[in-house]
């Protein structure tokens, strides 16, 4: 594979692999909690602790395809570095949500709201990349450098709670 092509996606691939490890960690927590209270077999029902772990994992799994689509679309069509940064922030927030959900449910709310903001940022990056493609196609105007500058400048603002 061409090194330039790999360089264009390596950060996105790294964030994706980290997210896979995180998913495996969440699944391990569900399995561990199930076996701790149900013996050797896996049950979908059980104690309150198991219900919380299972629900937190399921909520994270439900949002995972959306995250991957906007991460890769934003990275490929707009700019890889801000998309990868936002992806790492999303994984951090998802971890915070998961751990918060295991305690009081109100502890998971900041992670949930922060995660929605990051998904929105990635969606807007994706939309800007698609819009730029059609502006080039129909009008010959390329705003790629401007879009990259704006997305790179705005991405650190994701750190503000």
UniProtKB/Swiss-Prot annotation:
Q: Which GO terms describe its biological process?
A: cellular response to calcium ion; leukotriene biosynthetic process; leukotriene production involved in inflammatory response; protein homotrimerization
Question: What is the annotated localization of this protein?
Answer: Nucleus membrane; Endoplasmic reticulum membrane
Membrane topology classification: Multi-pass membrane protein
Q: Does the keyword Transport apply?
A: no
Write out the topological domains of type Lumenal. Answer: 1-8, 78-80, 129-161
Write down the PROSITE patterns for this protein, in alphabetical order: FLAP_GST2_LTC4S (PS01297)
User: Which residue stretches are annotated as topological domain Cytoplasmic?
Assistant: 31-52, 103-107
Cite a GO CC annotation.
nuclear membrane
Highest taxon in the source lineage = Eukaryota
First and last residue of the signal peptide: none
* Entries under SUPFAM superfamilies matching the protein: MAPEG domain-like
Keywords of the record, alphabetical order, are:
Endoplasmic reticulum, Leukotriene biosynthesis, Membrane, Nucleus, Transmembrane, Transmembrane helix
Please describe the quaternary structure of this protein. Answer: Homotrimer. Interacts with LTC4S and ALOX5.
The similarity comment for this entry is: Belongs to the MAPEG family.
Protein's UniProt name: Arachidonate 5-lipoxygenase-activating protein
Q: Give the species this sequence originates from.
A: Mus musculus
